[in-house]
Amino acid sequence: MVSEGGSALARAGGVLALDLDGVLFLSPESAGVAGEYVDRRRVRVKVPRLRDVWEMRVSEPVWVSPSMIADVNAVIGLPGVRLVLVSSWGAAAVEAARQAGLMVPDSVVNVFEGRTVGAVNQDVKLAEALTYLRECAAAGERVVWVDDLHVPGFVEHGGIVTVGTSEDAGLTGPMVAQVRSLLGG
């Protein structure tokens, strides 16, 4: 179904582009943001085959909300939804997301797959991710990009809906519901 004006956002499915830190990986305590997931669990993410920019093995404690992860997994499981990771975790992003409980299909695109953990600065991250996601939008895919570096809330421009989160609270329940709605669920 296409809404009046032919918005690309009226079709089911599309790209769900996720950062990890500040989106799925949260502060240990509730940030007091309306609608935030308040359950927290500490996960030690270990990717021993990789080294970070300091030549140390990748092994980091992160905090996640199991309830949020379950809700995001439901969005990833919607028909036609394609997961894209856009995180400075670089080559470790897929494994980090999986260890945190995220459903990461084999078809996932990790925009920074070949990059060392910590080697992607935020300006480069945003520019390179935007280039990739613009290609997706130009090919007719609906794109929803969630990152704590975006302006807070939901903004659509150039065929991409950006979702700005609080770096401490990450995705909130209402945000996940809106993302689900945008991707046809």
What are these regions (language model features)?
Residues 94-185:
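C-terminal cap/substrate-recognition subdomain and adjoining C-terminal extension
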Residues 2-5, 9-115:
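Alpha-helical substrate-recognition element adjacent to the catalytic core
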